[in-house]
């Protein structure tokens, strides 16, 4: 469910924000977690157990690190949590690539894993969130989060799930624990304005520029080999600008949504 899709703009976002604003401050995190899990499941419920498992591992690792004295056991917990978390990312993103490489180099006949054709939603972003959190608890930069709901919201909140940004736990902890005054009219206005500007960058600029480079160097277009030098450069520049405005637009929409929620 992309931020610029009709389903998100006219169904999910209004309902999610409306419910979030209506509930008391003490249950906002629980509501946001449910909304984030629904958003995640829209991209593929198959991967929900993996995401929940990764969150649980690092939540438990944080509590263990907080309870253990300085010494080798803490380092073992840190390494185990990081290895398990990173292994999930590597498995999902690179297993089929490695199988293809082996088939080419060693003439093996390994079949690709079809269920890995669609990656878990946001796995790169929440993997690095989890690793940064556990490392910060280990080094004493942050205290271990005791609330599983607050921790899960930090990792899986839907505004940051698709394209980040990767925000450190210490930069969000105070807001996530704030039960009164989190949402204000000014934040809602500023966030909505930021979201609209990001949406414009994505829909008006990025998508329009994408159509240009597709006509020149994309599949079904003129083709880079057949294009003149100026036209080829135009296609390359258009592709670069499309990537920039696509990422900038999504990032701005993400930040706008987060600001609207406090």
Say what each PLM segment does.
Residues 1-262:
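Membrane-embedded transmembrane alpha-helical bundles that form the catalytic cores
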């Amino acid at each position: 469910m992309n931020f610029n899709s009709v389903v998100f703009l006219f169904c999910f976002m209004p309902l999610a924000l409306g419910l979030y604003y209506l509930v008391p401050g003490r249950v906002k995190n629980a509501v946001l977690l449910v909304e984030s899990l629904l958003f995640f499941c829209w991209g593929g419920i198959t991967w929900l157990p993996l995401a929940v498992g990764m969150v649980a591992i690092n939540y438990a690792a944080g509590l263990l690190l907080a309870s253990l004295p300085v010494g080798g056991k803490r380092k073992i917990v840190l390494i185990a949590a990081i290895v398990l978390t990173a292994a999930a990312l590597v498995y999902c993103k690179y297993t089929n690539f490695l199988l293809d490489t082996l088939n080419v180099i060693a003439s093996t006949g390994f079949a690709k894993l079809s269920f890995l054709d669609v990656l878990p939603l946001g796995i790169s972003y929440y993997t690095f969130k989890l690793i940064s959190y556990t490392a910060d608890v280990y080094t004493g930069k942050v205290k271990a989060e005791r609330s599983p709901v607050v921790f899960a919201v930090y990792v899986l909140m839907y505004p940051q799930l698709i394209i980040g940004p990767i925000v450190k736990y210490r930069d969000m902890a105070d807001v996530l624990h704030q039960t009164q005054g989190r949402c204000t009219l000014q934040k809602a206005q500023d966030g909505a304005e930021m979201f609209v500007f990001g949406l414009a960058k994505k829909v008006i600029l990025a998508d329009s520029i994408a159509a240009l480079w597709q006509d020149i160097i994309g599949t079904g277009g003129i083709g880079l080999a057949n294009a003149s030098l100026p036209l080829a450069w135009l296609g390359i520049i258009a592709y670069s600008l499309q990537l920039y405005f696509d990422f900038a637009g999504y990032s701005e929409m993400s930040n706008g949504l987060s600001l609207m929620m406090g």
